[in-house]
C-alpha cells in the first residue's frame, strides 16, 4: 500500500491525477480482498440458513413454522427498532477515529450502546407484560405455548440488541475474518443444530426458539472479547464521551433508526401481517419463501459489510470517484453471484419449495414474484450503503419509508384475499420502490456514474446464460427437482466452457491479483477516475 500511494518522482501537473488513480487502485484492491471474505462467509451463512429453514418447516409443519417465523419476526423487528440506527452509526463513526488506548474510538461505545439497551429493556418488559393479549394474534398456531414463546422472544431483545451493536463495532476494529467468523459462521451453524436438536427431542416451539436464541448470547460474548483489545478496553482507554460525541453520533444515527427497523423487518412485517390477516399456514408458507429470498441476498450483504467502513473513509475524505469505483465493482460481483440464484428461484420455485414439504408448494407464485423483484434489489447494488456512509441517512429514510408505505398499503389490500401470494406482491412492489428511489438519491449525492458498461454486459450475459440453462431444464424435465438438476448441470458445463476462454482466464487472474494486493492488478484494471474532493 505504501508503494501504491508514494508520489511519483516526476510528479508535475499530473501529480493529483496520478495520486487519485493510485488511491482508486488501492481502494479497489482492498474492496476485492474484503469482498471475497464477505462472500465466502455469506455462502456458508446462506447454506446453513437454508438448513435452518428445512429444520423449521419439516420439524413444525406449516402452522408451527408460521408461529416460529412470526416469533423470529417479533424479535427481529423489535431489535431493529431498539437499536435506533446505532449499528450503522458505529460503522460510520469508528473508521473515522483512532483505535487503541490513546485513541478516541472507545468513547463511541457508551454513546452507541446505552440508549439502545435502555430501549431494549423497556420493550422486553412491556412485551412480557402484554404477552397474554398479543400472543393469540401474533403467534396463531402455537397453541398453549403462545404466551411462553412470546415472553421468551421479548426477553431476548436486549441481548440481541447488544449483539447487533457489538458486531458492527467488530467489523470496524478487526479484520473482516473476525466478523465473518461470528456473523456468518457461529450464528448460522449453531442455530440449525440447536433447533434441530429441540425438534428431534419433541421439545416444541418454546424449546426450538430457545435453540434459535442461544447462539445470539454466544455471539455477544465472542464480540466482547474481540473488540476489547483494539479499542483498549480494560487497559486505560477513555470511555467517557464528550457532549460533541453524543451530538455528532446521534445526528447521524437517529434518522437511520426508522429506516434500520424497516430494512431489518421488511420480510418479517409481511410474515406478521400474513399471520394476522390470513392465518398461520399462509404465514408459514410466506416465511419459507422469504428464507429463500433472504438467502439469495446474502451475497450483497457480505459485500456490504465488507466495504462499508471503506466507503465511510472515502466519502469522509471527499473521494467520491474512488467510492463510486468501489461501488461499481461490487455491484458487478453481486449481480453475477445473485442473479443466477434469483432466476433459478423464479423458474424452479416448485422444486425449491418441495424440499420443505408438499404443503409448502402453495408458495410457488409468491416465490416467482419475489425472485423477480430481487433482481431490481441486487441490480442497483448497495446504493443504501453509499447514502448511509456518505452521511445522508435522511435520504435513506425517505426511500425506506416509501417502500414500507407501498408494502403495508398493498398488503392490507391483497393479503386477506390472496394470502402468501398477496404478501409477496406487496413486498415486491415495496422492494422496487425503495431501491429505485435510493438509486436516484445515491447518484445525485455521489455525483458519479453508478452503472458502467461492464455492469450492463454482466447483466445481459447472466440473464442469457441462466435463461438458456433454465429453458433446457424445463423442456427436458419440467419445473420440479429433475428439471432443476438438468439446469444446474447445464450451468456447470457452461462455466467450465467459459474457463477455456483466454479473456475469462485473464479476468480471473486480475481479480486474484487484486485480492492478493498485487500492484500489477491495478495496472491491468486501468487507472481510477480523478478524485472529486470538494466538488
Model-predicted segments: where are they?
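Interhelical loop/hinge segments that connect adjacent transmembrane helices in multipass membrane
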Residues: 2-31, 205-211, 223-267, 306, ...
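Transmembrane helical elements of multi-pass membrane transporters/channels
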Residues: 33-50, 211-227, 240-313, 373, ...
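Interfacial segments at transmembrane-helix termini and the short loops linking adjacent helices
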Residues: 131-153, 328, 336, 345-375
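Membrane-interface junctions at transmembrane-helix termini in multi-pass inner-membrane proteins
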Residues: 159-183, 371-402, 444
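Hydrophobic alpha-helical transmembrane segments
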Residues: 151, 181-232, 252, 401-412, ...
